Amino acid sequence: MSKKIKRLSNRRVSKNAKFFGFFLLIATGLLILIMGLRLLQIATLKRVNSHNLTTATRQAFMQEQMVAATRGRIFSTDGEVLADNSTVYDLYAVLDKNQFDGKKPKYVQDKKETAKKLSSVIDLSEDDILKRLDSNKLQVEFGTAGKGLNIDQYNKIKAMKLTGVGFIPQPARYYPNNRMASHIIGLTNSITNAFGKNTLNGILGIEDTRNKSLKGKDGVKDYLGNQVSQGQNQVKNGDNVTLTLDEKLQTTLENRMDVMFDGTKAKSATAVLMDSKTGKILAATQRPNFDPNSQDGLKDNWVNLLNQSTFEPGSTMKTITLAAAIQEGKWHPNDTYQSGSLNIDGGRIVDAFGQNEGVLTYREGYWRSSNVAFAHVEQSLGATTWKKYIDRFHFLEPTHSDLPNEASGSISFQQAIDQANTAYGQAINVTTLQLLQAYSAIANNGKEVKPYLVEKVADSKTGKTLYQGKTTTVGQPITAATAKEVRKYMTDVVNQETGTAKQYDLRDAGYQISAKTGTAQISENGRYLDGLNNDIHSVMTIVPEENPRFIMYVAVRQPKVFPDPNIQLTLNKVFRPVMLQALNDSKSAVKSKTNEVKLPQVTGQSIDDARGKLEKAGLRVAVVGSTGRVKTQSVSAGSYALKDQLIILKANGKTLLPNMDGWSLAEAQRYANETGFNLKTDGTGFITKQSMEAGQEVNGQSVVSVELKEKE
């Protein structure tokens, strides 16, 4: 009996086993079928959970294989670096407790201590940092306070050896001269490119208009990790751009503008020096400006006052009216008129401050800057003829002078009163570059030349010139004879006792100049503001009067303080030192050609070898760093420098302060910017004394004071 039961039990077990095996086989088959169908779907559609696998795979591969192009540098015409490349760092903290390197934890362990230490370096409170570290996220960042950290901040945090704290390096732009010509040189921001990596993109100034040349083209590596050497995937580093700006003149202009702007507490100020024969802008700046490294001062300050801001030019426009009248035979300098006021079709024109100087000749009316005189001149010309000259001098149209978003200007010319107003600079709005361009016809014997800023664009690898800036004649609105006659009348404005530009007289330095001042009212909500502190005070100069070389414009808008008895005395403190420096430089230009040195390539060499090679060529050398090989040179290889010019080399290691005796302020400031120490100055000219001895280490915390004196 028991054997029978056992046989039945075995049969039941066997039957169950077969059933389970059959079920398992069916289930496995279904699972394989489902997985197969899913894989077939993925292979066909190449999508998972709405993610495109082809794109994701390509991006992952390309991100690994991308070779980033190096952005080109920007130089001054004398070879000094104005914009360079650097690296900044984005800070992050790992909170995921599963992150280990072997047995070592790679996440933040002591959150309170980490918050305390980080708060001493980044602009975020200890409590705010701790809140981020106490979050439930696997990894956190620190907002804008943790982005774009400079090398000093990076080194400080790195030295703290904080577990779980890391950095993501990002490309950045470095501007060695900080605020110098900031609106001209411009600015970049960081954008994510097609490969998913950050790259620099120009958004202001030359960085913007020459972005295509500067940025270059990213490349890729092949599957072996080698850079592709030909075809569309080859990396092409950005080209270098050289500007027409002269770094020495620019430095002098910036320093003088700082003093003037701080002293007047003005709303804004502008100054430009242009080569009248070529149109090259040799120096230009505006206030307020900004620091492109920190972006301090940028918030409400994006407008370039050279080409984007329009204004009524005031009495500087009278010179254009004078030129038109002479050209048309309508200028009668010895004829007389009644000054003070003039009624035209129900409108009233008055001279400055409502003054009535009695009966004046038209010649005297020009040097005294009489509005009434030039209203009469416009009426003599006729509105149609006068408008023809406004167009011939290329007002109301962009100059296309290498800067972005240029304004065209505007005019009110319907009524007789408006037509008369334009003759002395009201009812017409112009840009600074338009005014300079118009005056170039007077300085350049009738030939009107376009202002320009880009000297050349060159391949950063070979040095081959890809674009060469050149003089462009945009027209000839007047004859050479007319231009010379206008310049003669402009000397009256300087030489006559009642001339409005007598403050700018350079005859004591051996130069006769031509000049015209301007006091332009500012219109708001359909009416002119009252008071000298609500005007634009300006001067336009042509130097020298005979065979001119330079045009210079200086203007200050709405000064709150008048540090001198006459605002023109204040503007002269900008004009005189810059113009005399430019004249002295041009006088020695012929000599300089024989003293030029073509810069050799010294990057990659030892400091001693590089120094020896440059000093042998007659150049002075200062080094930032003290160990390793030379990484960069301040004047690029192949460029020309004058004998005895200071060349700054950058290497590694600590920096030892050089003997700066005899250095110019510009040289000392450049070296301080490269090194990071704070330079304090007393006086002008050349360094005669320094507070720290040569050979002492300097860094970002150092303060070096220098005394300067003019050479006798």
Regions inferred by a protein language model and the residue ranges of each:
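Extracytoplasmic
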Residues: 67-70, 77, 86-88, 162, ...
